[in-house]
Regions:
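Short, acidic, Ser/Thr-enriched surface-loop or helix-capping motifs
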Residues: 16, 66, 114, 225-226
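Amphipathic alpha-helical effector-binding/dimerization core
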Residues: 67-170, 174
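Cysteine/selenocysteine-centered motifs that mediate thiol-based redox chemistry or coordinate metal-sulfur cofactors
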Residues: 163-180, 256-275
């Protein structure tokens, strides 16, 4: 039987690829465009772009506003986009990404989603040099002390997160009272929101440095859906001595980039974050 050629040898239909440049330009701009501007964005002459737009319009991938002549994405493009979003499983899409991160960074990567009791691990990719941290599928991260918990707290509604934080705060206060020390007490929700959560939003990452397990640090990045809601967190975990936890470090940049790419695949645009 004849084997299929590798991707780089497969022949395509060039006219479809050229038309795709116009669709890419419309999707990137996110608004209807005049022919001249659309052609320039796609890197082609206006006359050539017009011919392709006529064909794309006939199949519903673009449509022209008769009142101003601008071109936008058509009903078929909308239908395809909605179907793509319905088929996009965040956990499935993120699994190979987290495995690649574990190999590239040399650290364990956890995937957490928001569950009934808070951020819950649903996938783990062990590092090549595994660290001994008691984590497994179903482990629930705290809101106050973990990178994943702080991340979800920064982006979810207060009504979802605050009750869990207050429960942790009461538990910490009780432990501190029994030990005769105030060292384990947590700040008020207002203080937590104005300091930690504000920083998490500004940096685009959650971070913990030895607060849960001594000598272990973590960075966590959010993956958003098309509504701007955090559907999961990618969290890199490793020994504090080896994990670069700087906001501007190479690991932070790599993690942000991976999470942003996943968010884009789920239909998220940076301007979609709720106020």
């Amino acid at each position: 039987m004849r084997e299929p050629k590798p991707d780089h040898e497969q022949r395509g239909i060039q006219s479809i690829e050229v038309g795709g440049q116009l669709l890419h330009a419309l999707a990137h701009q996110g608004r209807p465009m005049a022919l001249k501007d659309l052609a320039a964005a796609a890197g082609m002459a206006a006359a050539k772009a017009h011919a392709y737009l006529v064909s794309l319009g006939k199949i519903g991938l673009v449509e022209q506003d008769r009142s101003n002549g601008r071109y936008g994405l058509g009903p078929l493009a909308l239908q395809l986009g909605l179907m793509s979003l319905q088929q996009a499983d965040p956990v499935r899409l993120a699994t190979p990404v987290m495995e690649d991160l574990a190999q590239a960074t040399g650290h364990t990567v956890a995937m957490a989603v928001w569950g009934t009791h808070g951020p819950t691990i649903v996938r783990l990719a062990e590092s090549p040099a595994a660290i001994h941290v008691n984590m497994r599928h179903g482990t629930v991260f705290s809101i106050s002390g973990t990178a994943s918990g702080q991340l979800f707290a920064a982006h979810l509604a207060e009504s979802l997160v605050r009750p869990l934080y207050e429960a942790e705060r009461r538990a910490a206060a009780g432990q501190a009272s029994q030990a005769g020390s105030a060292a384990a007490k947590l700040p008020s929700w207002a203080e937590f929101a104005k300091t930690t959560l504000l920083e998490v939003r500004a940096q685009g990452l959650g971070r913990s440095e030895g607060t849960v397990v001594a000598g272990v640090s973590a960075l966590s990045a959010p993956v958003f859906d098309q509504r701007g809601q955090p559907v999961l967190a990618l969290t890199v975990i490793g020994p504090s001595a080896a994990l670069d936890s700087r906001w501007s470090g190479a690991l932070a940049q790599q993690l942000r980039s991976a999470a942003a790419a996943l968010s884009a695949r789920l239909g998220f645009r940076p301007g979609d974050l709720p106020d």
